[in-house]
């Protein structure tokens, strides 16, 4: 029920879209004239409508509905409901009377009654297309399958009604079936005249379907029609990032963010802007935009990983590590293996950087701890032991203590069981062990490893 009520705001727009009176009656001019007085002089409007309903029109259901719709268009739901009921009293099988009462119910946020009335209109007149559309709109955000079924039912009765394709696209979009939504919109656009809303929705569908180039084309066409469309300007920035057209993306970002006071910016807008800046190597400004994204929504702690990546590119490892710690600390559960591994590797890279040699022991200790966890969590994967070997090799640069030996041996025992093992990794393991035994003057054992290298890579 809660979801059903939440759809009301968007559905009121649908009343405008699908609630137009069918071809006007001979009395339409008089109805329109009287309708102009509804707000300023309701009594006089009522008199005019009463006059219209005299004589042969006393039981004219079409006219009753037309007057009711005039009241509804002015927001007068009580009067509109009264005329809808009068039409039903005259003819209980009047489909358009139920269509009107459904619109009144929707205006009053009574979506259950609205859907019931639309369904009754369809029952009374299976060709009442507006009732199909409105029923589909009511359930689109609550039970989209019901919407889909109703639209497909209408399509069998009115295959040439191009509006159905447009509505199908909306329903598929709601269901997350972006490929089908795209196909439906394409069908609509072949014969329809796209509006600003059409370009906006279609460009969004294409983006979600990862058709970034086509989305960008629709964005450009939409912006020609509506240069200030906020969503289209956003998509221009998003599409260009995905297309790796960073220059165009930054220009689109400048246009999109030209109104700093706009309340419709979301955290992801700043994330995309930051990634464009990062791609353009404007690292300081990229971090500033990532910070804005976090300030807007602190729950998205994954942004700290983006910040860490920027600092890593600048080789500012202390800040990269600090940001990565914030990323790990913001997780609701335990970090996965890949996150642990990347954190360990970040500490290893910091230890190898000449700018941070004073902190090398700290970075190596942290890296060793993390890679030990990786090795324990995935014992059949070589990476944990392999990177522990690299860490301990840095601790023992002359290989006099053989600190890396047990880890290279452990990694090698796993790698040798894998036919697709990377040659360079196998060579590194065997090289270390060959050199270790050479330092120990165990030349026969050393030679075994050098021969293994020649088997792996004869050109070495």
Set out the residue ranges of the language-model regions.
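Alpha-solenoid helical repeat scaffolds
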Residues: 4, 15, 20-440
């Amino acid at each position: 029920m809660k979801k059903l009520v939440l759809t009301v705001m968007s559905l009121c727009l649908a009343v405008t879209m699908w609630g137009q009176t069918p071809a006007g009656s001979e009395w339409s001019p008089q109805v329109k004239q009287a309708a102009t007085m509804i707000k300023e002089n309701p009594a006089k409007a009522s008199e005019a409508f009463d006059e219209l309903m005299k004589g042969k029109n006393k039981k004219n259901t079409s006219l009753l509905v037309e007057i009711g719709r005039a009241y509804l268009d002015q927001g007068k739901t009580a009067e509109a409901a009264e005329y809808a009921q009068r039409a039903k009293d005259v003819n209980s099988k009047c489909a358009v009377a139920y269509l009107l009462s459904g619109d009144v119910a929707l205006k009053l946020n009574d979506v259950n009654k609205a859907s019931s009335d639309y369904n009754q209109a369809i029952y009374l007149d299976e060709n009442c297309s507006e009732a199909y559309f409105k029923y589909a709109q009511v359930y689109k955000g609550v039970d989209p399958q019901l919407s889909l079924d109703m639209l497909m039912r209408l399509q069998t009765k009115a295959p040439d009604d191009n509006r159905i394709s447009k509505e199908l696209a909306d329903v598929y979009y709601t269901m997350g079936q972006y490929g089908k939504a795209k196909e439906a919109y394409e069908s609509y656009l072949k014969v329809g005249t796209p509006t600003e809303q059409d370009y906006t929705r279609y460009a969004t569908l294409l983006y979600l379907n990862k058709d970034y180039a086509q989305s960008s084309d629709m964005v450009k066409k939409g912006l020609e029609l509506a240069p200030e469309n906020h969503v289209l300007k956003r998509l221009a920035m998003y599409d260009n990032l995905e297309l790796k057209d960073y220059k165009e993306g930054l220009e689109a970002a400048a246009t999109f963010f030209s109104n700093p006071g706009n309340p419709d910016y979301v955290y992801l807008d700043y994330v995309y802007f930051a990634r464009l800046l990062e791609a353009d190597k404007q690292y300081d400004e990229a971090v500033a935009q990532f910070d804005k994204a976090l300030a807007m929504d602190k729950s998205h702690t994954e942004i700290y990983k983006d910040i860490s990546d920027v600092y890593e590119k600048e080789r500012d490892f202390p800040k990269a590590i600090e940001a990565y710690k914030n990323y790990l600390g913001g997780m609701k559960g335990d970090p996965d293996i890949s996150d642990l591994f990347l954190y360990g590797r970040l500490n290893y890279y910091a230890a190898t950087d000449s700018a941070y040699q004073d902190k090398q022991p700290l970075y190596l200790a942290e890296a060793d701890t993390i890679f030990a966890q990786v090795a324990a969590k995935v014992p059949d994967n070589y990476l944990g032991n392999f990177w522990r070997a690299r860490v301990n090799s840095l601790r023992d640069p002359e290989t006099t203590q053989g600190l890396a030996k047990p880890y290279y041996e452990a990694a090698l025992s796993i790698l040798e069981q894998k036919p697709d093992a990377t040659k360079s990794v196998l060579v590194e393991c065997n090289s270390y062990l060959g050199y270790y035994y050479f330092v120990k003057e165990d030349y026969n054992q050393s030679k075994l490893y050098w021969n293994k290298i020649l088997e792996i890579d004869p050109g070495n």
